[in-house]
């Protein structure tokens, strides 16, 4: 007997529960469910948001959003930890109060556990590459590192891995820079 898995769509994603403490993501028609992120994850994410928003206050070139629903295709809807889109992208990326399409930068903060690590490092990396996300960061609170990937011909290539004693800059947000240790400050 051959059983075929149903390919899920954005309509299925929209019908899933909200506010139950889980994250529901559909990647190429397959459902991924994860728990809400832990405290360290949230502190690192809050630090990143603060640093980037501080830069954007004096350089209003775009918008940063945490934990948005991002519809990439009819069979892929994800909830990245952070998304940045430029002002000139707003009309094409914001549709009916949701993000659709290709933002300038996507950031995932890795949560502990092999399934989480595999999803951010393999599954989402492949998804973001296939849909031409220009820049993707994987932030690892455990090792206090940030991997910066850039898109080249629908492949995300590891540009650099930064440690806590290094300086972070990005092509996605011109003029932005910070010391990596600022991202990993606990309180």
Regions found by a protein language model. Give the residues of each.
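Gly/Pro/Ser/Thr-rich low-complexity, intrinsically disordered segments predominantly at protein N-termini
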Residues: 1-187
């Amino acid at each position: 007997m051959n059983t075929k898995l149903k390919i899920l769509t954005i309509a299925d994603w929209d019908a899933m529960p909200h506010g139950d403490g889980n994250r529901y993501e559909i990647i190429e028609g397959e459902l991924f469910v994860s728990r809400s992120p832990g405290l360290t994850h949230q502190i690192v994410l809050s630090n990143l948001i603060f640093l980037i928003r501080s830069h954007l206050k004096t350089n209003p070139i775009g918008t940063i959003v945490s934990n948005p629903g991002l519809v990439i295709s009819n069979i892929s809807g994800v909830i990245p930890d952070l998304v940045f889109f430029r002002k000139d992208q707003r009309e094409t990326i914001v549709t009916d109060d949701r993000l659709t399409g290709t933002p300038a930068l996507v950031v995932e903060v890795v949560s502990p556990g092999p399934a989480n690590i595999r999803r951010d490092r393999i599954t989402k990396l492949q998804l973001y590459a296939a849909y031409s996300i220009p820049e993707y960061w994987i932030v690892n609170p455990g090792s206090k590192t940030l991997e910066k990937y850039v898109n080249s011909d629908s492949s995300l290539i590891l540009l650099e891995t930064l440690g806590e004693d290094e300086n972070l800059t990005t092509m996605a947000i011109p003029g932005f820079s910070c010391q990596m240790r600022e991202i990993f400050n606990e309180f």
